[in-house]
């Protein structure tokens, strides 16, 4: 890079990044794609840790639990809750928008809660529950989707 002169004013130009196509929009360039991947990954982890926190709370405050399990459950709940917020914060900073992050965390949390409920406690969700999950996720997606810009009327229809 020592042989190439920097552009005037210290700005960044396409010649500074020879492997990046100047024709790609910013959200499709390599750095943005990597950033988007890690944002989604952190949000998925946040949802999983949130589900683990709920499962730990159920373990800690169950009816027939001795003191050791109660203390272990509280420690696990605090730890997984802290991890959930850490990953969610990272996911927010790496995501393209907070809406994408919140939808991803909600999706991950609901599915992981269902899985952990089945594995740890033998809970089976009915079709009505899955229908509700589907409607919640559709609603979140509709609320947070990006609307296209309004169309300009054609010149002959502006009368």
From Swiss-Prot:
GO CC, alphabetical: membrane
Listed transmembrane segments: 37-57, 68-88, 100-120, 124-144
Coiled coil regions, renumbered to chain: none
Subcellular location: Membrane
SUPFAM superfamilies to which the protein is assigned, alphabetical: Multidrug resistance efflux transporter EmrE
Membrane topology qualifier: Multi-pass membrane protein
Source organism, top-level taxon: Eukaryota
Keyword entries, A-Z: Membrane, Transmembrane, Transmembrane helix
PANTHER family: TRANSMEMBRANE PROTEIN 42
Name of this chain's protein: Transmembrane protein 42
Organism: Bos taurus (Bovine)
């Amino acid at each position: 890079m020592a042989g190439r002169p920097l552009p005037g004013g210290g700005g960044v130009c396409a010649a500074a990044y020879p492997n990046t196509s100047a024709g790609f929009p910013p959200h499709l360039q390599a750095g943005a794609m990597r950033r988007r991947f890690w944002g989604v990954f952190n949000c998925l982890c946040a949802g999983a840790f949130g589900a683990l926190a709920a499962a730990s709370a159920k373990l800690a405050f169950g009816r027939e639990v001795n003191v050791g399990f109660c203390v272990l459950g509280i420690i696990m709940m605090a730890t997984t809750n802290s991890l959930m917020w850490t990953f969610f914060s990272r996911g927010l900073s790496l995501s393209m928008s907070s809406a994408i992050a919140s939808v991803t965390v909600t999706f991950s949390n609901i599915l992981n809660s269902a899985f952990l409920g089945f594995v740890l406690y033998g809970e089976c969700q009915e079709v009505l529950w899955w229908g509700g999950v589907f409607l919640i996720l559709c609603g979140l997606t509709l609320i947070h989707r990006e609307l296209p810009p309004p169309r300009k009327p054609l010149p002959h229809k502006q009368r």
